[in-house]
C-alpha cells in the first residue's frame, strides 16, 4: 500500500482548502493541459485574466482556468495528459489550480490540483508514477486520489455553509476536512463515502496556518497504520492563498 503513504505525505502539505501551489512551472516541470472531449448544454471557462469564453470540444485549458457549467449541462475533460479524466456535472464551478508533469506523459510524474467550488465532479485517475499526486480541494478540506474512480460534490446550504461528499468508487481516497474547528481524516475504500455537512463554514486562513503540523501528524499516523514503513516523500513549503470573501460559490 505504498500509494497510501505517498498520498498521506503530500496531503500534509495540501490538506486544507486555501492551500495552493505555485502557478508557474518550476525548473524541470512541464505545464500540463486539459482538453475538452465532450460538451452538452451551456458551459464556459474563464482565464486567469478574467476573460470568459465558451467551452467547445477540443478547447485546451491550462492552470488557473475556471470552468462553469449551466443547468442540464455536463463536460468531459481529459486532465494533464494521460493522468485522468473528469466529468463535470451541471451547475458546477471548478478551477484547475495546477497541472504539471516531469518526464514523459506516460511514465513521468504528474502533479494535478483541482479546486471544486460548487457542484459535482466524477472521474478516473490512472495509476501512474508512485510520486504523482492528484488533489481535489473544497472549502472544507482536500482529497488525495490515486489509481481511483472517485466523485466529489459540494452543495451550498444557502447560509454561507456547505455540505461536501467524498466518494471512492474504486481504489482508495484519503480525505481531510475541518469540522467545527477540529480536523477529521478518513480513508475511503471502494464504495465508501464521507459527507461533511451541517453548519460547516469554509476553512479560514488563520486555522490553516495553525493546523498544518497537526494535520501532518494525523495523516502520517494513518499511513503508518496501513503501511508501517516511514513516509519519506519530501514535504515542500506550504503556500496559503486567501479565499475571496462574500463569494456565492460553495465549497
What is each model feature region?
Residues 26-44:
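Short N-terminal segments immediately surrounding and downstream of signal-peptide cleavage
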Residues 65-71:
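A short, solvent-exposed beta-strand micro-motif common in secreted/extracellular proteins
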Residues 95-126:
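A broadly used, surface-exposed interaction patch
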Residues 72-76, 94-95, 122, 149-151:
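Histidine-centered metal-chelating micro-motifs
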Residues 45-46, 51-53:
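Periplasm-facing N-terminal accessory domains of Gram-negative outer-membrane beta-barrel systems
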Residues 1-31, 52-57, 76-89, 101-111, ...:
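C-terminal interaction modules
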Amino acid at each position: 500500500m505504498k500509494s497510501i503513504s505517498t498520498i498521506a505525505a503530500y496531503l500534509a502539505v495540501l490538506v486544507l482548502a486555501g492551500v495552493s501551489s505555485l502557478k508557474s512551472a518550476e525548473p524541470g516541470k512541464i505545464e500540463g493541459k486539459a482538453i475538452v472531449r465532450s460538451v452538452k448544454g451551456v458551459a464556459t471557462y474563464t482565464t486567469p485574466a478574467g476573460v470568459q469564453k465558451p467551452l467547445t470540444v477540443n478547447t485546451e485549458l491550462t492552470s488557473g482556468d475556471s470552468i462553469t457549467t449551466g443547468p442540464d449541462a455536463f463536460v468531459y475533460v481529459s486532465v494533464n495528459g494521460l493522468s485522468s479524466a473528469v466529468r463535470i456535472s451541471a451547475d458546477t464551478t471548478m478551477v484547475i489550480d495546477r497541472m504539471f508533469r516531469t518526464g514523459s506523459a506516460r511514465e513521468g510524474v504528474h502533479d494535478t490540483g483541482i479546486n471544486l467550488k460548487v457542484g459535482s465532479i466524477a472521474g478516473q485517475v490512472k495509476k501512474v508514477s508512485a510520486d504523482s499526486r492528484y488533489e481535489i480541494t473544497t472549502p472544507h478540506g482536500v482529497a488525495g486520489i490515486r489509481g481511483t474512480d472517485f466523485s466529489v460534490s459540494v452543495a451550498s446550504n444557502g447560509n454561507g455553509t456547505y455540505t461536501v461528499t467524498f466518494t471512492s468508487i474504486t481504489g482508495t481516497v484519503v480525505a481531510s476536512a475541518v469540522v467545527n474547528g477540529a480536523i477529521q481524516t478518513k480513508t475511503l475504500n471502494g464504495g465508501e463515502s464521507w459527507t461533511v455537512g451541517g453548519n460547516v463554514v469554509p476553512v479560514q486562513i488563520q486555522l490553516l496556518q495553525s493546523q498544518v503540523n497537526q494535520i501532518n501528524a494525523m495523516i502520517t499516523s494513518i499511513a503508518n497504520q496501513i503501511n508501517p514503513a516511514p513516509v519519506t516523500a519530501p514535504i515542500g513549503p506550504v503556500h496559503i492563498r486567501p479565499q475571496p470573501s462574500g463569494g456565492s460559490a460553495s465549497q
